[in-house]
Amino acid sequence: MADVSTSEPIVIDLPGGESIEVNNSHWTEIASADWNHLRDDGFVQWTQTICRHEYGRILVYVVLLPTSGILKTAGEILPAGTDVTDAVERLAQRFDVPSNVPYSCIQRYRRALRESR
């Protein structure tokens, strides 16, 4: 699996051609799920993550490491308090993420919200 939790920043591609670096002190991971799959030509790895910015915005993103080894990313920044479900599912569809990954990520996010109250 791609180690997206390292100290190296990951550049997430956002809509409109913008991008953002994550894995810094401004974004706190709330929930994450990952999966890898062996194909004839090697492993494919998916990671889906939900982070909260220090000012409350939410970043939902997916990282795909295909057998080519070229990292692909996509993400969306949502206003504070927005339901993340649609964004998580939309991004998962973009990279054919197995359904257990967005499901687990959403469930972990909801659990984290309940525990923080």
Identify the meaning behind each predicted range.
Residues 17, 53-55, 65:
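Generic structural motif
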Residues 58-68:
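A short, structured beta-strand/loop element
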